């Protein structure tokens, strides 16, 4: 290329060269840069060149810069280097047109332009550098008509190996590397017209800037650089420094195909807008002076420069633009971070778009300025290192946020805040963004052609309220935008935008900003307002469906996408200088009047969970319900596709208007062991569906209280009983403890049998007790007892002594079966001696029950031992005689020792707890449910109120009142009733477990009485865990009858002497002092 075409064109060419910063050195007379074309730089020319002696005739555009001299000087070396030397870049034009073959014509205008423009820029730069170029090259330099859209490209463009000289490989050919091949460029860039226009404009505008002289590091710099480094080879070292960001890039590397460099380099071109490699080359032209000397450095300053760009620029710059580029490259080298990474072709192709932003400005800027701009871009968009095959600096691709990454720490730099579609948590650390008042579920959005319909209202009146918790140091902005409300991840809504509302009634300040084409409303959160804001300044604007649907890549349909969410986001400053980003979205808001009138809407539903067996009735309340409405339950997999879908059975006769009653269908997998969340929705047709609501299926076992199950065989190994204690406030002492019977699973179970045993042991202990403080006998009519859960705590054994009771009952049946010992003649009250001390553990195993000493330190305080189990248990501190009546099998009454425990100050009076079961059956039979060890354990704590009698009606069918143990505990100085409610088998894996007879809250103050009628429970006792599967009621009756026959009358008399008969009043059901 010669300076013959210089002049106005030369100036343009120079500018273009700088902008392109990659103009290849003018090829030798025989070589013609085919890839140069007036893409982005005015200095680029497309020429039909008569085949010079060394070149094939090919139209091509050459910069007017003085690149020829460099090219001529460097071309030999370049050819020798086989494209590995940056010098070769200067000579690239030659190699492009080298004898290897004439440049291959590309019929794709955009591609030709792209390829040509980089080369042209470079070549123009070379001309501006006053490099000597053959006349044919000058001809090439002549501005070709815009009609010449294609340029024959030499194979060297695509394959550096094709061009004999390294320089040629470096030239635009190099930028036509595999990644930057015209084909790739062609498919990357499709707006040929715009590119042509840009190229034409840059012909006139870019050349001045492109010219080396015009640029800070003009041709003189390039020449100087050449002088410093001598041949192109010397330039290559320099080039690599310039590419320092890519300093690691070797001549081979940058010469190696840089597919993406061409496209990505487009940003480098002054016409950054050009998406074609030519554009990149043009930009490189501006950078080319620097790039050519140091192709990689030149591009590195333009971290955004792609392989093609910096290769072309470097090649052309090395040849003609080298000097000018050198200074430019030097600056670039310093400007571009050393860590700059080369991007892949794709990245390069994408990046040009970013670079376009500054391409126009850069076109008018001097090469140095362009370089700085490019550098800024490069630093802003770090380059990504490609495989060894792509060792070129590609234009950094714009940073694009990938799809939501759940679990990502929401800490961001202020310079790179997350995009609006980035998922953020609502709570992190001590900070939480919260919507205190949700918006209404319907708000009619207004169109652009109509007036505002006001701000979004709240369902409770007023407006939504948003508050930030955990931070109040200084005011921050609350950002609000309209987001989607579909099943996909949250993102800005395509068809709705937030609309700022102003007026006298608006109390909240706000301002609108645009973030990525989305309108965002900024509302201040002030510490004086407790970091809270009422959103009375936000309306919803509906965009035209056609405007959105016609957008490239838009797949949503406006009329089917009318639900939105109000999305709020804050960026909280952190001490590190970064920000913590939080985001919260409101409930879905329907913005279409038609949809609001036609689509069903579920406002509430009666239950939100049930067992996997289903069958429960659910009442759904809402609007737009029709007689033919259906409710569908479905479960979605991780991929969002339905895995299970079933229709709920609607009970039509119970449905009324806005209420639908349905039967929850069973879950498809009843064997689940954990709760499963599904969804349900109401539909009036295929396209009219309500929002999905959540529903939970729970395993059957989840409805039961899980308690460790202890095999009876392992029970004896338990060393210490665990008395159950329930603490509750007391009127005088503060808390009392109630001992109760415990069920194995703490489930309420009704006992079909008519009796429950009071004492479970192979031998009934002989108990001789006398009541010193209470003259009134306590009578208990056995009946099923409710076992309620309570806190079980171990207690130390209580030592006590007692006189053996004369009544000795031998039990020959199963050791686990309880025995009720009583007189078969009449009511025998067994009075337990209160001041007798309990001195040891009572072993209630298979061996005869040892004497149990009971001691009461306080008069009037009583304790009761409900059951003795085969386990080793601590006996209760105090025992109280309790009489119970039996009207079955000829036994009038049975007296069984019942330990009534008290801990604390004496109670003023003990009240009998009476139960009136309606079972029919033999008098004292052990209920299988009661076979579990039952024990009342002492309860620690301050004095508790006294127990009041509690009437109990057994739900079981029957007419006779059958004996069953009842517990009565009283540990208190004053009387606060301990209420016992419920029924069920007395089955507990541990003999030391007791359940409180009633909820602590139910205890009234002193003197007050409460009568509770427990609801019947139809659950059968669980014998599987009891070990009584083979025991029948008949066996129990036989055993009890046999044992009772062994009781001597004398023993019964002795007991009766010690304990006076109970008064008839105490036998009445439900009668007590407090009742």
From Swiss-Prot:
N-acetylthreonine: residues carrying this PTM: 2
The UniProt record lists the keyword Transmembrane: no
Modified residues (Phosphoserine): 344, 372, 1063, 1066
Region (3 X SP repeats): 207-308
Coarse class of the protein's main subcellular location: cytoplasm
One BP term from GO: regulation of transcription by RNA polymerase II
Keyword field: Acetylation, Activator, Cytoplasm, Developmental protein, DNA-binding, Nucleus, Phosphoprotein, Repeat, Transcription, Transcription regulation, Ubl conjugation
DNA-binding region: 444-451
InterPro entries, per database record: Ig-like_fold, Ig_E-set, IPT_dom, NFAT, p53-like_TF_DNA-bd_sf, RHD_dimer, RHD_DNA_bind_dom, RHD_DNA_bind_dom_sf
Region described as Calcineurin-binding: 109-114
Gene Ontology cellular-component annotations: chromatin; cytoplasm; cytosol; nucleoplasm; nucleus; transcription regulator complex
Region Disordered, residue ranges: 18-37, 205-306, 711-739, 887-988, 1049-1075
Chain ranges for the short sequence motif Nuclear localization signal as given in the UniProt record: 273-275, 686-688
UniProt subcellular location: Cytoplasm; Nucleus
Chain intervals with Polar residues compositional bias: 236-253, 724-739, 887-912, 970-981
Entry comment, domain topic: Rel Similarity Domain (RSD) allows DNA-binding and cooperative interactions with AP1 factors.
Protein name: Nuclear factor of activated T-cells, cytoplasmic 3
Organism: Homo sapiens
